[in-house]
Amino acid sequence: MPSAHTLPVLDLSQADDPAQRADFLKQLHAAARDTGFLHLTGHGVTAAESARILELTRAFFALPEADRLAVSNLNSPHFRGYTRIGHELTGGASDWRDQLDVGAERPAPVVGPDDPAFLWLEGPNQWPAALPELRTVVLDWQSRLAAVAHRLLQELLVAIGAPADFFDEAFAERPHLHTKLIRYPGSAPSGADQGVGAHKDYGFLTLLLQDSVGGLQVVRDGGYVDVPPMPGAFVVNLGELLEIATEGYLTATDHRVVSPPGAVERYSVPFFYNPRLDAVIETVPGEYLRSAPGVAHDDSNPLHAQYGRNELKGWVRAHPAVARRWHPELASV
Protein backbone atom coordinates (compact mmCIF):
# COMPACT_ATOMS: atom_id res chain seq x y z
CA MET A 1 0.00 0.00 0.00
CA PRO A 2 1.34 3.48 -0.80
CA SER A 3 2.31 5.43 2.28
CA ALA A 4 1.46 9.03 3.08
CA HIS A 5 4.05 11.46 1.77
CA THR A 6 4.51 15.21 1.84
CA LEU A 7 5.92 16.99 -1.19
CA PRO A 8 8.26 19.96 -0.81
CA VAL A 9 6.28 23.07 0.16
CA LEU A 10 7.38 26.36 -1.43
CA ASP A 11 6.03 29.84 -0.73
CA LEU A 12 6.19 31.90 -3.93
CA SER A 13 5.90 35.16 -2.00
CA GLN A 14 9.38 34.51 -0.59
CA ALA A 15 10.79 35.25 -4.04
CA ASP A 16 9.89 38.91 -3.41
CA ASP A 17 11.66 39.06 -0.03
CA PRO A 18 15.39 39.82 -0.32
CA ALA A 19 15.99 38.04 2.99
CA GLN A 20 14.31 34.83 1.80
CA ARG A 21 14.82 34.85 -1.96
CA ALA A 22 18.07 32.88 -2.06
CA ASP A 23 16.63 30.13 0.13
CA PHE A 24 13.47 30.01 -1.98
CA LEU A 25 15.48 29.57 -5.18
CA LYS A 26 17.55 26.83 -3.55
CA GLN A 27 14.41 24.96 -2.50
CA LEU A 28 12.83 25.40 -5.93
CA HIS A 29 15.98 24.10 -7.61
CA ALA A 30 16.02 20.99 -5.40
CA ALA A 31 12.31 20.27 -5.82
CA ALA A 32 12.42 20.62 -9.60
CA ARG A 33 15.54 18.49 -9.97
CA ASP A 34 14.88 15.76 -7.41
CA THR A 35 11.09 15.44 -7.28
CA GLY A 36 9.44 17.23 -10.18
CA PHE A 37 6.49 17.89 -7.86
CA LEU A 38 5.84 20.45 -5.12
CA HIS A 39 3.13 22.22 -3.15
CA LEU A 40 2.98 25.95 -3.95
CA THR A 41 1.65 28.52 -1.48
CA GLY A 42 1.97 32.30 -1.46
CA HIS A 43 0.71 32.43 -5.04
CA GLY A 44 -1.84 35.21 -4.55
CA VAL A 45 -4.90 33.21 -5.61
CA THR A 46 -7.49 33.63 -2.87
CA ALA A 47 -9.36 30.91 -1.03
CA ALA A 48 -12.59 32.45 -2.34
CA GLU A 49 -11.44 32.12 -5.95
CA SER A 50 -10.49 28.49 -5.43
CA ALA A 51 -13.75 27.71 -3.65
CA ARG A 52 -15.74 29.34 -6.44
CA ILE A 53 -14.24 27.31 -9.26
CA LEU A 54 -14.65 24.08 -7.28
CA GLU A 55 -18.26 25.08 -6.56
CA LEU A 56 -18.95 25.56 -10.28
CA THR A 57 -17.11 22.35 -11.13
CA ARG A 58 -19.50 20.44 -8.87
CA ALA A 59 -22.42 22.37 -10.36
CA PHE A 60 -21.43 21.39 -13.89
CA PHE A 61 -21.33 17.69 -13.08
CA ALA A 62 -24.65 18.01 -11.23
CA LEU A 63 -26.33 19.14 -14.46
CA PRO A 64 -28.60 16.63 -16.20
CA GLU A 65 -26.64 14.37 -18.51
CA ALA A 66 -28.39 15.89 -21.53
CA ASP A 67 -26.98 19.33 -20.65
CA ARG A 68 -23.47 17.93 -20.35
CA LEU A 69 -23.75 15.94 -23.57
CA ALA A 70 -24.90 19.09 -25.36
CA VAL A 71 -21.28 20.26 -25.05
CA SER A 72 -19.71 16.88 -25.86
CA ASN A 73 -16.18 17.06 -27.21
CA LEU A 74 -17.41 14.94 -30.11
CA ASN A 75 -18.94 18.20 -31.38
CA SER A 76 -15.57 19.95 -31.47
CA PRO A 77 -12.74 19.61 -34.00
CA HIS A 78 -10.65 21.43 -31.36
CA PHE A 79 -11.05 18.67 -28.71
CA ARG A 80 -12.98 21.05 -26.42
CA GLY A 81 -15.95 20.14 -24.30
CA TYR A 82 -17.32 17.31 -22.17
CA THR A 83 -15.88 13.79 -22.11
CA ARG A 84 -18.08 11.06 -20.69
CA ILE A 85 -16.86 8.62 -18.04
CA GLY A 86 -14.50 6.06 -19.51
CA HIS A 87 -14.10 7.84 -22.85
CA GLU A 88 -10.59 9.20 -22.25
CA LEU A 89 -7.59 6.89 -22.51
CA THR A 90 -4.28 6.94 -20.65
CA GLY A 91 -1.75 4.33 -21.66
CA GLY A 92 -4.43 2.76 -23.85
CA ALA A 93 -6.78 2.08 -20.90
CA SER A 94 -9.99 3.92 -20.00
CA ASP A 95 -9.91 6.48 -17.19
CA TRP A 96 -12.82 6.31 -14.74
CA ARG A 97 -13.63 10.01 -14.73
CA ASP A 98 -15.50 12.60 -16.75
CA GLN A 99 -14.34 16.11 -17.53
CA LEU A 100 -14.82 19.42 -19.29
CA ASP A 101 -11.84 20.63 -21.35
CA VAL A 102 -11.41 24.38 -21.79
CA GLY A 103 -8.68 26.28 -23.63
CA ALA A 104 -8.02 29.91 -24.45
CA GLU A 105 -11.16 31.37 -26.04
CA ARG A 106 -10.19 32.05 -29.66
CA PRO A 107 -11.93 31.96 -33.05
CA ALA A 108 -11.87 28.75 -35.06
CA PRO A 109 -8.77 28.77 -37.27
CA VAL A 110 -8.76 28.32 -41.02
CA VAL A 111 -6.46 25.34 -41.48
CA GLY A 112 -5.24 24.76 -45.02
CA PRO A 113 -3.93 21.47 -46.43
CA ASP A 114 -0.33 22.61 -46.05
CA ASP A 115 -0.75 24.02 -42.54
CA PRO A 116 0.35 22.05 -39.47
CA ALA A 117 -2.52 19.98 -38.10
CA PHE A 118 -1.88 21.19 -34.56
CA LEU A 119 -3.53 24.49 -35.49
CA TRP A 120 -6.83 22.67 -34.95
CA LEU A 121 -6.07 22.77 -31.22
CA GLU A 122 -6.99 26.45 -31.13
CA GLY A 123 -10.60 27.51 -31.36
CA PRO A 124 -13.75 28.22 -29.37
CA ASN A 125 -14.81 26.43 -26.23
CA GLN A 126 -18.20 24.87 -25.57
CA TRP A 127 -20.15 26.24 -22.61
CA PRO A 128 -23.29 24.75 -21.01
CA ALA A 129 -26.32 26.97 -21.50
CA ALA A 130 -27.66 25.84 -18.12
CA LEU A 131 -24.64 27.25 -16.26
CA PRO A 132 -23.87 30.62 -17.92
CA GLU A 133 -21.58 31.87 -15.14
CA LEU A 134 -19.11 29.06 -15.80
CA ARG A 135 -17.51 30.80 -18.78
CA THR A 136 -16.42 33.95 -16.95
CA VAL A 137 -15.16 32.11 -13.88
CA VAL A 138 -13.12 29.53 -15.79
CA LEU A 139 -11.56 32.03 -18.20
CA ASP A 140 -10.68 34.36 -15.32
CA TRP A 141 -9.18 31.41 -13.44
CA GLN A 142 -7.14 30.50 -16.49
CA SER A 143 -5.73 34.02 -16.73
CA ARG A 144 -4.90 34.12 -13.02
CA LEU A 145 -3.05 30.82 -13.09
CA ALA A 146 -1.21 31.69 -16.30
CA ALA A 147 0.34 34.65 -14.47
CA VAL A 148 1.31 32.47 -11.50
CA ALA A 149 2.78 29.79 -13.76
CA HIS A 150 4.80 32.28 -15.80
CA ARG A 151 6.27 33.82 -12.66
CA LEU A 152 7.15 30.37 -11.35
CA LEU A 153 8.74 29.38 -14.65
CA GLN A 154 10.93 32.49 -14.61
CA GLU A 155 12.00 31.82 -11.02
CA LEU A 156 12.79 28.22 -11.93
CA LEU A 157 15.08 29.38 -14.72
CA VAL A 158 16.87 31.73 -12.34
CA ALA A 159 17.17 28.90 -9.81
CA ILE A 160 19.18 26.76 -12.25
CA GLY A 161 21.33 29.69 -13.36
CA ALA A 162 19.59 30.46 -16.65
CA PRO A 163 18.15 33.77 -17.95
CA ALA A 164 14.72 34.40 -16.44
CA ASP A 165 13.31 35.46 -19.80
CA PHE A 166 14.64 32.50 -21.81
CA PHE A 167 11.15 31.15 -22.58
CA ASP A 168 9.34 34.49 -22.80
CA GLU A 169 9.28 34.50 -26.60
CA ALA A 170 7.93 30.94 -26.74
CA PHE A 171 5.01 31.98 -24.52
CA ALA A 172 4.44 35.38 -26.12
CA GLU A 173 1.07 36.41 -27.57
CA ARG A 174 -0.65 33.00 -27.75
CA PRO A 175 0.47 30.62 -25.00
CA HIS A 176 -1.41 27.34 -25.08
CA LEU A 177 -3.57 27.41 -21.95
CA HIS A 178 -5.68 24.43 -20.94
CA THR A 179 -7.97 23.86 -17.96
CA LYS A 180 -9.82 20.68 -17.05
CA LEU A 181 -12.79 20.42 -14.71
CA ILE A 182 -12.71 16.80 -13.54
CA ARG A 183 -14.96 14.47 -11.57
CA TYR A 184 -13.83 11.06 -10.32
CA PRO A 185 -17.19 9.37 -9.61
CA GLY A 186 -16.15 6.75 -7.07
CA SER A 187 -15.24 3.17 -7.84
CA ALA A 188 -15.81 1.65 -11.27
CA PRO A 189 -18.31 -1.24 -11.40
CA SER A 190 -15.50 -3.45 -12.69
CA GLY A 191 -13.45 -2.82 -9.57
CA ALA A 192 -10.66 -1.18 -11.57
CA ASP A 193 -9.17 1.79 -9.72
CA GLN A 194 -7.74 3.79 -12.65
CA GLY A 195 -9.10 7.27 -12.08
CA VAL A 196 -6.39 8.37 -14.48
CA GLY A 197 -3.57 6.07 -15.47
CA ALA A 198 0.12 6.55 -14.84
CA HIS A 199 1.64 9.23 -17.05
CA LYS A 200 3.94 12.22 -17.26
CA ASP A 201 2.57 15.55 -18.42
CA TYR A 202 4.17 16.32 -21.77
CA GLY A 203 4.31 20.11 -21.56
CA PHE A 204 5.88 22.64 -19.20
CA LEU A 205 4.02 23.29 -15.93
CA THR A 206 0.82 21.96 -14.37
CA LEU A 207 -0.92 23.66 -11.43
CA LEU A 208 -3.52 21.44 -9.76
CA LEU A 209 -6.35 22.51 -7.48
CA GLN A 210 -7.92 19.51 -5.75
CA ASP A 211 -10.66 19.05 -3.20
CA SER A 212 -10.18 17.30 0.14
CA VAL A 213 -10.76 13.72 -1.04
CA GLY A 214 -7.27 12.78 -2.24
CA GLY A 215 -6.20 10.07 -4.66
CA LEU A 216 -3.22 11.66 -6.43
CA GLN A 217 -0.11 9.47 -6.29
CA VAL A 218 3.44 10.24 -7.43
CA VAL A 219 6.39 7.94 -8.07
CA ARG A 220 9.10 8.22 -5.39
CA ASP A 221 11.94 5.77 -4.81
CA GLY A 222 10.50 3.26 -7.24
CA GLY A 223 6.95 3.16 -5.87
CA TYR A 224 3.82 5.29 -5.69
CA VAL A 225 3.21 7.53 -2.69
CA ASP A 226 0.08 9.47 -1.79
CA VAL A 227 -0.08 13.25 -2.16
CA PRO A 228 -2.64 14.37 0.44
CA PRO A 229 -4.42 17.63 -0.42
CA MET A 230 -2.95 20.72 1.25
CA PRO A 231 -5.47 23.54 1.78
CA GLY A 232 -4.45 26.77 0.07
CA ALA A 233 -1.75 25.13 -2.05
CA PHE A 234 -1.50 24.10 -5.67
CA VAL A 235 0.24 20.88 -6.55
CA VAL A 236 2.78 21.84 -9.22
CA ASN A 237 4.53 19.38 -11.49
CA LEU A 238 7.00 19.69 -14.33
CA GLY A 239 6.31 18.28 -17.77
CA GLU A 240 8.48 16.33 -20.18
CA LEU A 241 9.40 19.31 -22.34
CA LEU A 242 11.09 21.01 -19.38
CA GLU A 243 13.01 17.80 -18.79
CA ILE A 244 14.04 17.71 -22.44
CA ALA A 245 14.88 21.44 -22.54
CA THR A 246 17.30 20.90 -19.64
CA GLU A 247 18.83 17.67 -21.02
CA GLY A 248 17.28 15.64 -18.21
CA TYR A 249 18.48 17.95 -15.42
CA LEU A 250 14.91 18.76 -14.32
CA THR A 251 12.46 15.97 -13.62
CA ALA A 252 9.09 15.05 -15.11
CA THR A 253 7.60 12.45 -12.78
CA ASP A 254 5.07 9.69 -13.36
CA HIS A 255 1.82 10.18 -11.47
CA ARG A 256 -1.72 8.80 -11.42
CA VAL A 257 -5.06 9.15 -9.65
CA VAL A 258 -6.61 6.21 -7.81
CA SER A 259 -10.41 6.24 -7.85
CA PRO A 260 -12.01 7.19 -4.54
CA PRO A 261 -13.75 4.38 -2.66
CA GLY A 262 -17.39 3.43 -3.08
CA ALA A 263 -19.65 6.31 -4.07
CA VAL A 264 -17.25 9.05 -2.91
CA GLU A 265 -16.65 11.66 -5.61
CA ARG A 266 -13.43 13.60 -6.11
CA TYR A 267 -13.20 16.93 -7.95
CA SER A 268 -10.09 18.62 -9.28
CA VAL A 269 -9.11 21.46 -11.61
CA PRO A 270 -5.71 21.06 -13.28
CA PHE A 271 -4.31 23.94 -15.31
CA PHE A 272 -1.63 23.35 -17.94
CA TYR A 273 0.73 26.17 -18.90
CA ASN A 274 2.40 25.60 -22.24
CA PRO A 275 3.99 27.67 -25.03
CA ARG A 276 2.60 28.70 -28.39
CA LEU A 277 1.79 25.72 -30.55
CA ASP A 278 4.38 26.70 -33.16
CA ALA A 279 7.13 27.37 -30.60
CA VAL A 280 10.34 25.35 -31.03
CA ILE A 281 11.82 24.48 -27.65
CA GLU A 282 15.59 24.87 -27.41
CA THR A 283 18.01 23.77 -24.71
CA VAL A 284 18.16 26.14 -21.74
CA PRO A 285 21.71 27.53 -21.42
CA GLY A 286 23.64 27.40 -18.17
CA GLU A 287 26.40 25.80 -16.13
CA TYR A 288 23.88 23.24 -14.84
CA LEU A 289 24.29 21.38 -18.16
CA ARG A 290 27.58 19.95 -16.88
CA SER A 291 25.48 17.84 -14.50
CA ALA A 292 22.65 17.05 -16.93
CA PRO A 293 22.36 13.29 -17.53
CA GLY A 294 20.55 13.50 -20.86
CA VAL A 295 17.07 12.22 -21.63
CA ALA A 296 16.07 8.60 -22.17
CA HIS A 297 13.91 8.45 -25.29
CA ASP A 298 10.82 6.27 -25.54
CA ASP A 299 10.21 5.07 -29.11
CA SER A 300 6.51 4.56 -28.33
CA ASN A 301 6.16 8.17 -27.22
CA PRO A 302 8.41 10.39 -29.35
CA LEU A 303 8.71 13.98 -28.18
CA HIS A 304 9.21 16.79 -30.67
CA ALA A 305 10.99 20.13 -30.38
CA GLN A 306 7.94 21.93 -31.82
CA TYR A 307 5.44 22.05 -28.99
CA GLY A 308 2.23 21.71 -31.02
CA ARG A 309 3.23 18.30 -32.37
CA ASN A 310 3.41 16.93 -28.83
CA GLU A 311 0.11 18.52 -27.86
CA LEU A 312 -1.67 17.10 -30.90
CA LYS A 313 -0.25 13.62 -30.31
CA GLY A 314 -1.53 13.69 -26.75
CA TRP A 315 -5.06 14.66 -27.75
CA VAL A 316 -5.32 12.12 -30.56
CA ARG A 317 -4.18 9.28 -28.31
CA ALA A 318 -6.38 10.29 -25.37
CA HIS A 319 -9.52 11.03 -27.43
CA PRO A 320 -9.49 8.70 -30.44
CA ALA A 321 -13.24 9.06 -31.04
CA VAL A 322 -12.86 12.82 -31.58
CA ALA A 323 -9.89 12.23 -33.86
CA ARG A 324 -11.78 9.65 -35.93
CA ARG A 325 -14.73 11.98 -36.36
CA TRP A 326 -12.88 15.16 -37.26
CA HIS A 327 -9.32 14.19 -38.17
CA PRO A 328 -9.18 10.62 -39.50
CA GLU A 329 -5.91 11.41 -41.26
CA LEU A 330 -4.26 11.80 -37.84
CA ALA A 331 -4.97 8.28 -36.60
CA SER A 332 -1.29 7.35 -36.79
CA VAL A 333 0.06 10.44 -34.97
Predicted segment positions?
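C-terminal flanking tails of non-heme Fe-dependent oxygenases
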Residues: 1-91, 96, 139-140, 144-333
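Core domains of carbohydrate- and sulfate-ester-processing enzymes
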Residues: 86-117
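A short, charged helix-loop
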Residues: 107-137
